[in-house]
């Protein structure tokens, strides 16, 4: 092979190898955008609520003119901007029964009329911690003279909610080991 032919062949092979490794030139391009989305739902969660144990009620001396107070707490955690409304069930209501309180605990024999009246109050109402109003707001489901409670939700941090109760003084009730009532707390949001 002549020397010029070798040079020409070498240059041709080199050119082919050089352009073979080069990216192909695009004839055009296309783009497409997309959105990343998510929805934040209103969610509220309550912790377990401990029993509201008033303790011993003495209608003869200690509680003859002063009610027996008690409270229990729970935490409420909601997404920011949720609008929770807390209500308490009204299982054993005392309305129209000429009793001292709005609610009633029984001693296991409700048919005999053995009830111990008590009240539960909306936080910050008369009788409750941090009271700011002139009349009590009885905590219930918004019916029968009761109110619900709508706490504000400034952020996702848990809030402690206090359920404050009073057993009114001087009730004429029979001796019993325990009086009780079952109350259900509900949060709607």
What kind of region is each of these model predictions?
Residues 1-11:
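Bacterial N-terminal signal peptides that target proteins for export
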Residues 10-19:
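Hydrophobic helical h-region of N-terminal Sec-dependent signal peptides
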Residues 21-23:
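N-terminal signal peptide c-region/cleavage motif recognized by signal peptidases
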């Amino acid at each position: 092979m002549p020397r010029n032919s070798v040079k020409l062949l070498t240059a041709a092979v080199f050119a082919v190898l050089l352009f073979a490794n080069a990216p192909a030139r695009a004839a055009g391009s296309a783009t497409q955008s997309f959105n990343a989305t998510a929805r934040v739902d209103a969610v509220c969660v309550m912790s377990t609520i401990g029993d509201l144990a008033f303790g011993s009620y003495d209608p003869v001396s200690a509680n003859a003119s002063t009610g027996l107070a008690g409270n229990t707490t729970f935490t409420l955690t909601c997404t920011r901007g949720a609008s929770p409304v807390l209500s308490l069930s009204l299982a054993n209501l005392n309305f129209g029964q000429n009793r001292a309180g709005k609610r009633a605990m029984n001693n296991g024999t409700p048919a005999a009329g053995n009830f111990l009246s008590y009240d539960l109050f909306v936080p910050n109402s008369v009788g409750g911690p941090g009271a700011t109003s002139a009349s009590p707001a009885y905590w219930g489901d918004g019916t029968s003279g009761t109110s619900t409670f709508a706490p504000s939700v400034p952020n996702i941090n848990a809030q402690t909610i206090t359920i404050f109760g009073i057993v009114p003084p001087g009730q004429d009730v029979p001796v019993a080991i325990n009086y009780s009532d079952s109350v259900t707390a509900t949060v709607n949001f």
